[in-house]
Amino acid sequence: MTTSGVRVRIAPSPTGEPHVGTAYIALFNYLFAKKHGGEFILRIEDTDATRSTLEYEQKVLEALRWTGLTWSEGPDVGGPYGPYRQSERKPMYWPYAEELLEKGHAFRCFCTPERLEQMREAQRAAGKPPKYDGLCLHLKAEEVTTRVAAGEANVVRMKIPTEGSCDFHDGVYGDVSIPWDSVDMQVLIKADGMPTYHMANVIDDHLMKITHVARGEEWLASVPKHILLYRYFGWDQPTFMHLSLMRNADKSKLSKRKNPTSISYYSALGYLPEALMNFLGLFFIQIAEGEELLTMEELAAKFDPEALSKAGAIFDIQKLDWLNGRWLREKLTPEDFIARTLEWAMENSRLTEGLKLAQSRISKLGELPNLAGFLVSSDVGLTPASFAGLKSKPEEIHEILTTVAADLEKMPDWNVEAIEAELRDIAERTGKKLRVVTPPLFVAVSGSSRSLPLFDSMALLGRSVVRQRLKVAIAVVATMVGSGS
């Protein structure tokens, strides 16, 4: 690279709830920078205009700040290589696309989405992996000029060698060889003028003088495209390190369908950020049994990027619980414990707003734990008996809960008004009265049929906690359906 000193980055996309996988990759980069006396940079990759939102960007920033990580450059703190949002860098990318077109390293593609889908279907039917077939690769310059001038929609694709392989060294996987004929002619500039991840990623890493790219192993297959772009532009490429994905205990990819994956979920349930980062940091170091309790400074001191394994990092919630318990007992003084508990209870106004809702529903303060305790509880203790008092049969309860769980995932906003509107829409679509839809949800989110107002409660708990409680409720009710309860 053309810079002295190590520079690494974390580049999340603000398209959903901040994932623990983001914290995992961010921590590796942070520790790598600490180890080498380098710089840790935050960049927001919001080229997906249809899914990226400022609300999710704010959630990403809040979640990463909560973990205790700090960055020297980013959209919130600025820096010499900004802007640090890709959407604000859009004018920078087109000149590079023009350079690739002029040098013959890229071409314009006029294929419609319908034509591309037909192509993919035919390839799948033939048992071939879907990739662009090169229809527009050899269009004459005059035809391209005419169609562009006429305003015909097009994208810019990169050219790929047809023979040989891309050979490179990865900091985790060692020497890797990927045949060029397996690499797609990647879209670099979309029809709306925005760059794809691959184009923006390479250009931004170069302009921001990133020396080491550490990211998830799912990007390993994309390295040939990135290396090719570095070659086309005549730039030195960074060192690549592809980290093993975090996995469930059954070795499946960590996903919200099996385990809570949102950083906000762990914050809401009262996990200490130090404990979560301690837990994630153990994937990057080698220690003896009994030495697991480590601060960020101790993790940095023991961090050894040369000792990384290709084996999947198992996200064991039981181990996280054990580690968090040790932090609470061994790392906090009684005064710290009280202060952190109060800080957690007041987080996002969950407790204060909950108390306001409870005020008109109690006759004495001693009723508060039963009425509002679910707002600060990690588990509401659902059993088949929890749903036994409802008028709906288990089959209908199961249908309601699964429908609500699926629809809530699609909601762009999470607030009282949006939740109420969504549940009313579900009731209308399913032909049910709202008073039939809401009782199972009362039980699912609070553990009781008598609780605080449902829409307010769901808003206060947050999407990630509601998601997990619905998942547990669906599993409980499924046993009732199977047993004929």
From Swiss-Prot:
Q: Which residues bind ATP?
A: K256
Name the keywords, alphabetized.
Aminoacyl-tRNA synthetase, ATP-binding, Cytoplasm, Ligase, Metal-binding, Nucleotide-binding, Protein biosynthesis, Zinc
Q: Which reaction does it catalyse?
A: tRNA(Glu) + L-glutamate + ATP = L-glutamyl-tRNA(Glu) + AMP + diphosphate
Q: Which residues form the signal peptide?
A: none
Give the cofactor note text. Binds 1 zinc ion per subunit.
Q: Where is this motif: 'KMSKS' region?
A: 253-257
State the compartments where it is located.
Cytoplasm
What enzyme category does the UniProt record give? ligase
Q: Where along this sequence does the record place binding of Zn(2+)? A: C109, C111, C136, H138
Motif 'HIGH' region is found at 12-22
The protein's superkingdom reads: Bacteria
GO CC annotation, single: cytosol
- Pfam families to which the protein is assigned, alphabetical: Anticodon_2, tRNA-synt_1c
Q: Supply one GO molecular-function term.
A: ATP binding
Q: Tell me the cofactors it needs.
A: Zn(2+)
Assigned EC number: 6.1.1.17
Query: Could you give a single Gene Ontology term from the biological process aspect?
Result: glutamyl-tRNA aminoacylation
Family per similarity comment:
Belongs to the class-I aminoacyl-tRNA synthetase family. Glutamate--tRNA ligase type 1 subfamily.
Q: How does it assemble?
A: Monomer.
Give the protein's function.
Catalyzes the attachment of glutamate to tRNA(Glu) in a two-step reaction: glutamate is first activated by ATP to form Glu-AMP and then transferred to the acceptor end of tRNA(Glu).
The protein's name is Glutamate--tRNA ligase
According to its UniProt entry, this protein's organism is Agrobacterium fabrum (strain C58 / ATCC 33970) (Agrobacterium tumefaciens (strain C58))
